[in-house]
Amino acid sequence: MSQGMRLGIVGAGPTGKAHAAAAKQAGFRLISAADRIPDRLGALSAEFKLARSVSDAEELVHDPDLDAVSLCLPTHLHTPIAISALRAGKHVLIEMPPATTSRDAKAIARTAEKTGKIVLYAAVRRFGSAEQSAKQAIDKGYAGKIYHARATWLRTRGVPKGTGWYSDKSLSGGGAGVDLGLPMIDLLTHLIGSDVTHVSAVSHCCVTGLPVEEFVHGLLRFESGASAEVSVSWAMNQIPSQAGTTCRIHAQRAALDIYTPQGPVIYRGFENAGQGKPTPMKQPRVAGYPALFRHFKECIQGKTQPLVGAEAGVKLMQLAEALYRSIETGKTIEIKHKTDTDKGS
C-alpha cells in the first residue's frame, strides 16, 4: 500500500462517479469499476483511466489487486456484495442506507467482525464543512446542553431517478424516510451525541402516487433527554422558501443554524438582549465525500475507528424499522438497540 491504497468502485452511476472523484482526491489509487450498464461503466472507466472494468460485482470484489471497495448499489445488493468483499479480504465503504433490514445490517457486522476488515457507511452529512463546524462548537461546550433540534430535507420535485428500485420497499428499504430521513436523523444523533430511544412518525404519498412514502415527519426522543423534529420529502407542494435543507440546534446557552447562505451560524447572548447575536463559524477546507474517503483511509491505516461503522449501521436500520412501525401503527415506538453480532436477529 506504499503507493496508495487500491480501490474498486461497484456501481458506475452518479454516486459511483462522486465516490471515484472523492477517493482520488483522498489519495486512493482507482484500479477498477463494475457495472451492468456498459455505457456508464465505459464512461467512468474512461474519465478516471481505470485499468479494469467488469460487469460482475463479484468478480471485482475478488480481485487480489484491490485493498478496498466502494459500494454504490441498489440497497438490497449491499448485504450480499459487502459480505463477499469482506470475505475476500477487502475493506468496504457502503452508501446509505446501510441495508434493507436490521437483520441484513447485522449480517454485514458479523462478517466484518470475523474478517477483521473495516466497514464504513457513507453518512456523508457528518463530513460536510458546516456540520463539522457545528459539531466542533458543540463539543467545545459553546452551546451548552442540547434540548431540542429541528431538521428538514424538503424537495418540491426530487424523486430519485433510476430503474425503479427506489420505489420498491423490498429493494430500497423504504421511500423518503430512509433515503432522506435516515441521513438527517444520523446527523442529529451525531450532533446531539446521543442515541434515539423513541420515535413517533407519520407519512404521506399525495403527489407522486408511489407505493412508498414521499413525505415523512417524525418526533424523536434521545437518551440524553433531548427531542427533535425531522421532516423530509421527495415531492411536496410547498412555499419556495421552505424547500431545501435545514438543521437548527437549540441548547442551554446558544442556538445553531447550520445551513445558511453564510454557512453555519451560532447565536449567543440571549440572556443579555433576549435576542441572540449571530456569529458565523469557521469551516474546514475539506468536506463531504473527500473528507469521508480520507476518514476511510485513516480507518484502514488503523489511525482511527469508523465514525459510522458496522455496528452503527445496525442501529440505523433498527431506527428505520421503528420509524416504519410507528407509521403503520400510529404509536410511539421505543428503540432498544441490540447490536450483538453473535445473534442473527
Predicted regions and their residues:
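N-terminal Rossmann-like dinucleotide-binding module
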Residues: 1-48
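C-terminal helix-rich "cap/oligomerization" subdomain common to oxidoreductases
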Residues: 1-4, 68-71, 117, 223, ...
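Beta-loop-alpha module in the N-terminal Rossmann-like domain of NAD(P)-dependent dehydrogenases
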Residues: 19, 48-111
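Hydrophobic residues in well-ordered beta-strands that form the structural core
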Residues: 94, 119-121, 150, 230, ...
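Rossmann-fold dehydrogenase core element
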Residues: 106-125, 145-149
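Predominantly a Rossmann-like dinucleotide-binding segment in NAD(P)-dependent oxidoreductases
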Residues: 125-210, 330
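Contiguous beta-strand/loop segments that form the cofactor/metal-binding neighborhood of enzyme cores
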Residues: 186-263, 290-303, 336, 340-345
